Amino acid sequence: MKLLVLCVFAMMATLAVSRRYQFVQHQYIRKAFEVALKVEIIAGFDRTLVKWLRNHGRGLNENQRKVLYFVNRRYMQTHWQNYMLWIVKKTNALGRPPVVADYRALGAEIGRRIDMGYFYNFLKNRVMIPKYLPYMRRLNNMRPEDVPVANRNPGK
């Protein structure tokens, strides 16, 4: 039940962030750019989580902490295409072809700007942190660059 509510909350946040009720056209980027984005986004989210745990995580056990790391990765997966809308806008504004460093900077900005502390507080205060399950462990054990996202163009 808790996981269902978490998924519904993520879906509502997706709709709120996208500000539209239509399909978000998929944007595809090269693997090197994808890796740079994922590493920086997850690093930013994890830094936020470490700070949040230091201030608010006293009542959480080890498995609940691991679930919050899972929330970071799942949040990135859920919102990947919305990030791509913003990233395409930013890379087009450069006036030159983007390089990996540009994508690293954009990923770091996403990881820094999104207030994940709000979600951690929401889950903790409403006792909605789900049990730590095997699929969460599999995603947490992946390196950030290996976390799957919707970036594979089926036509290529």
UniProtKB/Swiss-Prot annotation:
Sperm. GO terms for biological process: single fertilization. InterPro entries: Egg_lysin, Egg_lysin_sf. It is found in: Cytoplasmic vesicle, Secretory vesicle, Acrosome lumen. Keywords: Cytoplasmic vesicle, Fertilization, Signal. One of its GO terms (cellular component) is acrosomal lumen. The keyword Signal applies. Monomer. Homodimer. Molecules associate into dimers and then rapidly dissociate again. Interacts (as a monomer) with the egg vitelline layer protein VERL (via VERL repeats); each VERL chain can bind multiple copies of lysin. This is Egg-lysin. It comes from Haliotis cracherodii.
